[in-house]
C-alpha cells in the first residue's frame, strides 16, 4: 500500500497483529506474541509489526490500532517453539477455555506475554490469548500512544458465559482511556421529589467516551 498517500485521508489503520505463526512457519509459535519468542524470532511479534508500520512505513502511531485475536492455534508438537507435524488448526477462545485443566496444562510465556496449553500426553499445544495477555497488549498500546485496539472476532469469545476477553478490553483499555481523558466528576448527586402532577422524571446526560454508569436511587427516607 502507498501509505504516504493514504495517511492524510484515513482516520486509522487496523493492524492485523495476529497469525504471526501458523502452518507456514518453520516452527510452532504464538498466534499473537507481544514480543518475539524466542528472542530474535524471524517470524516477528506485535512489537516488530508496529515498529515496521511506524518507523519504516511512516504511519503515525496514534493512527494505528493493534489487532487482538479471540482465537488460537493448535499444533502437533510438545513445545511452544518446537517443530510440528501435520496441519495447524484454528480454535475459537470459546473452544479453548473449557480445555484448561481438563487434559491440558496451562503455561505462561513471559517473553511473549502470552499463554498456551500443553496436552497432558505432550502431543499437542494450543497458543491463544486470555485476559492476562490482553492486559499486557492494552497497556503496551497505551504506552505507545496507539490509536486503540481492535479484535477479530467478537463471536469467538466465551459468549455463553462471561465474555471474558471482551470484558478484559473493557477493563484494561477503556478504563485506561477513562483515567487518561476523564473530564467528568466521578460522582454526582441529583435531588428530586414526588410531584403528583408529573410523576415521571427523565435524566439526560452525555458521555464523551464509553464508560460504565452506576445509578443508585434512594427514597425520601434514604433507603436504597
Locate each region found by the language model.
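Substrate-binding surface in catalytic domains of secreted glycosidases
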Residues: 1-99
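Acidic-and-aromatic substrate-binding clefts and catalytic sites of carbohydrate-active enzymes
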Residues: 155-160
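Glycan-binding loop/region signatures in secreted carbohydrate-active enzymes
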Residues: 24, 30, 63-140, 167-173
